[in-house]
Regions:
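Conserved small/polar residues in nucleotide/adenosyl-binding loops
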Residues: 288-289
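Hydrophobic alpha-helical transmembrane segments
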Residues: 23-43, 259-285
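Membrane-interface amphipathic/juxtamembrane segments adjacent to transmembrane helices
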Residues: 63-75
Length: 290
């Protein structure tokens, strides 16, 4: 993962470096770099996502449904896929629980239908099919693997049309959720069940359903206006990452000023180093507590 993080910054450096390479005075470098933070952030995020997609796709070649030894290469590929997907939930959180999530999972290899809402789902993408108008809530899991001390069970999952998997709901390997069904919060899929049923609990039992009429333009079929407004709001999710990069740059800027003021002064090298260390110390300390 560290390797992918480093690689994701390379295109941004390639873009920005020519803009400051000819500047000889450091006071002029940082203001120029500030102007490039938005472009650098977007390019870094896009490169990171592309790198994750490539790695997950490559690992998917090894991962096929079945039972495998816990010490096999397939088990290692499954483990690495889970690690990458979990890290992505943190590093690429702005694209989760948004209109971009279905496209992101398609890029990773999942089959995603129309008008699907997906939050922070954990899954093995290429083994998952989420059909039209379905909803997967926060921390839901699909095509999850089963483990013992000696084997790992890998299987596919299909979420039927207009079905709902609640918060932390689990749909295991080789299990499908039929159309118009509900797996409630903190519940598991009971296996082969009838369409239109609802299930609750870790040892799931069926619960009654209440018929409610609602406007489909506010749920399954939002208007174009709602889609556009949602897209505008969700595009703003990258702004906090831009501010994070801004703080990184400002920290380096302040440390550079302190270094240049004392290191090239009339003080001895020992005195300059002592003053530089003394004055620079509060900067990273205060930054880490923001």
């Amino acid at each position: 993962m560290r390797f992918l993080q480093i690689v994701s910054m390379i295109p941004g450096f390639v873009l920005v470096y020519p803009q400051v390479a000819s500047i000889e005075v450091y006071e002029e470098v940082f203001p120029r770099l500030l102007l490039w933070i938005p472009a650098f952030t977007i390019l870094m995020a896009a490169t990171w996502l592309a790198g994750v997609a490539v790695v997950v796709r490559l690992l998917s070649v090894m991962i096929r449904p079945g039972f495998y030894s816990s010490h096999s290469a397939v088990a290692a590929a499954v483990w690495l896929t889970h690690v990458i997907m979990q890290r992505t939930l943190i590093s690429a959180y702005p694209i989760y629980a948004s209109g971009f999530t279905p496209a992101w999972l398609r890029l990773l290899g999942a089959r995603i239908g129309k008008n699907v809402e997906i939050s922070t789902v954990e899954t093995i993408p290429h083994l998952t099919w989420i059909r039209d108008n379905s909803f997967l809530a926060d921390h839901s899991s699909a095509s999850t693997t089963r483990h013992s001390s000696h084997w790992v069970h890998i299987g596919t999952t299909v979420i039927g049309e207009r079905s709902f998997v609640g918060n932390s709901g689990i749909v295991g390997p080789d299990q499908d959720v039929p159309d118009d069904s509900l797996i409630a919060v903190l519940s598991t899929n009971p296996g082969q069940v009838d369409a239109g049923s609802s299930w609750l609990g870790q040892n799931p039992h069926q619960i009654p359903r209440r018929v409610v009429d609602s406007d489909s333009t506010a749920t399954y079929e939002p208007t174009r206006k709602l889609r556009i407004l949602r897209g505008i709001v969700e595009c703003c999710r990258i702004i906090p990452q831009m501010f994070s990069n801004l703080l990184d740059l400002l920290t380096i800027w302040v440390l550079t000023i302190i270094y240049m003021q004392f290191w090239f002064s009339d003080l001895s090298q020992a005195e300059a180093l002592a003053w530089t260390s003394l004055l620079a110390w509060p900067v990273p300390v205060s930054y880490t507590h923001l």
